[in-house]
Amino acid sequence: MKFLKYFLIIPLFLNAELVIEITQGSDNPYRIALIPFKGESGATKQANEIVKNDLIRTGEFYIFDEKSLIAYPSGEDDINYSDWRLINADYLLLTSVIDSDSGIEARYEIFDVRKKSKIRSPKVYGVTNNVRQLSHYVSDGIYEAITGIQGIASTKILYVSQSNEVDTLSLIHI
């Protein structure tokens, strides 16, 4: 019986924390030429940065620096695939953001440089004041189209933190 008391009381004093640190991505990442988002609004630059960072953080992609891009095609007809093979790009992404009174629309086209073909060209809609979430959905679509695995940039994590004996329930968007 005494053993049972200790067995029930000891877990109250134990504390464990799980920390996952990603220090390296893929040894052979997909090389992507991300043409900066077209658009007039401030949402355009924000969306470009979010999508770029989401893809980099997966560890599966290498995004070419904007200064190393050799052309800025505005549509499928402007793409010269041999140019993109010169810099060893695997994929080319053309993107745009359209801001209107009814909301925001992001369009993106993914081109496989080796196969010289378009592999996806969807539109994603969202509310004007939530460019971040819309951008995460775009990132997920790009990730899934290239890897075949569902993206996780728009997922949510629920966690409980404790400080000064007060529990706080938090929901975060990643």
Identify the meaning behind each predicted range.
Residues 94, 159-160:
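Residue position within the beta-strands of beta-propeller blades
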Residues 9-16:
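Hydrophobic h-region of N-terminal signal peptides that target proteins for export
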Residues 143-153:
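Structural signature of eukaryotic scaffold interfaces centered on beta-propeller domains
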Residues 2-9:
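Sec-dependent signal peptide recognition
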Residues 99-101, 163-167:
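Short glycine/acidic-enriched loop and turn motifs that connect beta-strands
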Residues 18, 52, 76-141:
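Amphipathic beta-strand/beta-sheet edge segments enriched in Tyr/Trp
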Residues 172-174:
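Conserved small/polar residues in nucleotide/adenosyl-binding loops
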Residues 21-82, 93:
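Short beta-strand->alpha-helix linker/helix-N-cap micro-motif
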